[in-house]
Design a protein with these regions (language model features):
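Extracellular/periplasmic metallocenter environments
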Residues: 1, 28, 81-147
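Envelope-exposed proteins and targeting segments
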Residues: 15-19, 38-42, 52-54, 83, ...
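N-terminal pre-domain segments of enzymes
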Residues: 1-15
Length: 147
């Protein structure tokens, strides 16, 4: 139930970090780009700072496209899925999601016309780094090196 290409509903006890996202009437998400590791469970705390209703839906490009087409056909359709949050002006909500696949996924607002106006963002899921050394290494500065 609720599983899509981007992963599956997460369990609060497994949340590794919280990412805050705001939605505005400029039809923008802030931030509009998020990077997570495969297997991570993320709590998205989403706030609608606009006057209009906005939503945040997480999925693959195909999931979002299909959902958007449904919303165009049935604009008043009530839908409550674990991969989305639907917020009136000033409201705050959350999505707890576990990213099980590596790749690029989307989050978008599918209120009629908002997606087309550019209300979308990218979630990049990367493989967890097994080599911890690579993380701490700083690039060596060779500018002072002389022969």
């Amino acid at each position: 139930e609720g599983v899509n290409k981007a992963g599956k509903p997460g369990v609060a006890a497994n949340v590794v970090r919280t990412i805050h996202i705001t939605m505005s009437d400029k039809n923008r998400f802030s931030p509009n780009s998020v990077k997570v590791k495969q297997g991570e469970t993320i709590r998205f705390v989403v706030k609608n700072v606009g006057k209009k209703k906005h939503e945040m839906v997480i999925g693959s490009v195909e999931d979002i496209k299909a959902h958007n087409e449904m919303m165009q056909r049935f604009p008043g359709m009530e839908h409550d899925e674990p991969n989305m949050v639907d917020l009136e002006s000033g409201q705050k909500g959350e999505i707890i999601w576990q990213f099980t696949e590596v790749g690029q996924f989307q989050f978008a607002c599918l209120v009629t016309g908002h997606f087309e106006a550019g209300m979308k963002g990218v979630i990049t899921v990367v493989k967890p780094s097994t080599n911890v050394k690579a993380k701490v290494q700083t690039p060596v500065d060779h500018s002072t090196h002389q022969h």
